[in-house]
């Protein structure tokens, strides 16, 4: 029977980053992905990397992630295509301005001192296509940006294999053997594996992996759409990721065109990734309001992926006490690509050193039983 110190269920950015961090510390790692690495939510995300969150723990996590991505190629030998064009949050309601004032105070306190306020006139200069008629203010952080999900995932996977990790594609986890309250092994579509520790990195499918161990992991899948225009020079590659916070509409330069998206707040949870063309019409309607020039941009392609959403829009990181040897790195609620680099480091530290350099206690699974939920408000 095959065996491993750690089995990772899921080969998206989180699983691959964790495989790398554990393997480079001489842990015998087996990662199992039922399709191909990075082919699900990771491969369908917008690639955003930001630090402007409402929860301090998320800001600290993201400051670490940005530093990791800045040094990614030097560490892994693989480019990340991390372009720090910044994130511009566009605020149109008085309550948003008040909330972001509190955010800004916290950001500066924890060291994100480059984040600053931008008035509507400056925002219009930064993003010439932006309609600022109803804008009350904006926040901007120049060290935020966008990176390539494919490059970062591939870089982690290659580096993990270089350190001895086994990453298997086309192999599905179909069961977890639990005896006397602890993990004993996993069953897969190609055979059984003996292990004492399983990491649930299955993204939108994390609840299914949890149920295999008799656990209820509160993660639901929600469809999110992305559209990319044809060539559109009015949004140059230096423009920031721009977010209309009230509607969740966002856009950023993508190649010689523009990538845009928006949350469908009426879409129920489910695993469909079919494109809803009626909803895409709403995206373009909002684009025409917030950035009128985009109304003339032709659609080049569109797709949909899945958010893995928890009740408080915060990740679940660390051990699940009910089953010894079952750990989670899931439920990132749309922030998995940007948070995985730091989460992988901190989880490997917690597992091997019994403590992490940044406290990830706020992301513990036990918060659900305690009812100690504090929602992350800056969700797109």
Q: What is the predicted role of each segment?
A:
Residues 288-380:
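C-terminal catalytic lobe of FAD-dependent flavoproteins
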Residues 47-126, 248-250, 286-288:
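Dinucleotide-binding Rossmann-like beta1-alpha1 core, especially the glycine-rich loop
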Residues 216, 231-328:
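Active-site lid/adjacent beta-loop-alpha segment flanking the redox-cofactor pocket in flavoenzymes
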Residues 191-238:
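Central helical "cap/lid" subdomain
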Residues 60-61, 90-98, 140-158, 274-279:
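Short beta-strand to alpha-helix junction loop
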Residues 23-43:
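Glycine-rich FAD pyrophosphate-binding loop
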Residues 4-30:
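N-terminal Rossmann-like FAD-binding beta1-loop-alpha1 element of flavoenzymes
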Residues 139-196:
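Helical element adjacent to the flavin cofactor pocket in flavoenzyme catalytic cores
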């Amino acid at each position: 029977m095959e065996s491993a110190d750690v089995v990772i269920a899921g080969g998206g950015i989180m699983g691959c980053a964790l495989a790398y961090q554990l393997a480079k510390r001489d842990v015998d790692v087996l990662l199992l992905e039922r399709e191909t690495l990075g082919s699900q939510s990771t491969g369908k995300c917008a690639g955003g990397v930001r630090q402007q969150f409402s929860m301090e723990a998320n800001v600290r996590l993201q400051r670490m992630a940005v530093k990791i991505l800045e040094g990614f190629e030097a560490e892994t030998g693989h480019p990340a295509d991390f372009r720090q064009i910044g994130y511009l949050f566009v605020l149109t309601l008085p309550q948003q301005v008040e909330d972001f004032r509190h955010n800004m105070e916290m950001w500066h306190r924890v060291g994100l001192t480059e984040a600053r306020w931008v008035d509507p006139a400056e925002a219009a200069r930064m993003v010439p296509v932006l309609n600022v008629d109803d804008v009350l203010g904006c926040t901007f952080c120049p060290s935020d940006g966008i990176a390539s999900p494919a490059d970062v995932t591939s870089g982690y996977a290659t580096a993990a294999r270089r350190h001895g990790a086994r990453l298997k594609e086309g192999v599905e986890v179909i069961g977890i053997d639990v005896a006397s309250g602890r993990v004993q092994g996993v069953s897969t579509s190609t055979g059984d594996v003996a292990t004492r520790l399983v990491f649930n990195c299955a993204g939108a499918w994390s609840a299914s992996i949890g149920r295999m161990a008799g656990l209820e992991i509160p993660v639901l899948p929600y469809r999110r759409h992305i559209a990319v225009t044809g060539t559109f020079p009015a949004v140059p590659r230096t423009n920031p990721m721009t977010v209309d916070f009230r509607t969740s509409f966002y856009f950023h330069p993508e190649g010689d065109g523009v990538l845009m998206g928006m949350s469908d707040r009426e879409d129920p949870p489910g695993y469909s990734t079919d494109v809803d063309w009626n909803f895409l019409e709403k995206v373009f309607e909002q684009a025409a309001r917030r950035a009128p020039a985009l109304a003339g941009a032709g659609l080049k392609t569109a797709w949909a992926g899945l958010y893995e959403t928890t009740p408080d829009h915060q990740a679940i990181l660390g051990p699940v006490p009910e089953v010894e040897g079952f750990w989670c790195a899931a439920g990132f609620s749309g922030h998995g690509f940007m948070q995985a680099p730091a989460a992988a480091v901190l989880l490997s530290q917690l597992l091997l050193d019994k403590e992490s350099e940044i406290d990830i206690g706020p992301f513990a699974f036990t918060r659900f039983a305690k009812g100690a939920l504090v929602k992350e408000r800056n969700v797109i």
